[in-house]
From Swiss-Prot:
Tissue specificity: Expressed by the venom duct.
GO MF entries: toxin activity
Lineage per the UniProt record: Eukaryota, Metazoa, Spiralia, Lophotrochozoa, Mollusca
Subcellular location: Secreted
General function of this protein: Probable neurotoxin.
UniProt keyword Disulfide bond present: yes
Domain free text: The cysteine framework is VI/VII (C-C-CC-C-C).
Keywords tagged on the record: Disulfide bond, Knottin, Neurotoxin, Secreted, Signal, Toxin
Protein species of origin: Californiconus californicus
Cellular component annotations (GO), alphabetically ordered: extracellular region
Disulfide bonds: 24-41, 31-45, 40-50
Name listed for the protein in its UniProt record: Conotoxin Cal6.25
Leader sequence segment: 1-22
């Protein structure tokens, strides 16, 4: 059960990361709200969103 939960969480994190990158590339609004930064499409910001 624990391994299954870990896999589910990993998939969710990757999905959120992918969606966040898509939003950042299209307009950048989501990342600005999350991190209060304007340069939301930089690699650092994407990593921070994925990790956060």
């Amino acid at each position: 059960m624990k391994l299954t939960h870990v896999l589910i969480v990993a998939v969710l994190v990757l999905t959120v990361c992918h969606l966040t990158m898509a939003v950042c590339k299209s307009g950048g609004q989501a990342c600005w709200f999350l991190l209060k930064k304007h340069n939301c499409c930089s690699g650092y910001c994407i990593v921070a969103v994925c990790a956060g």
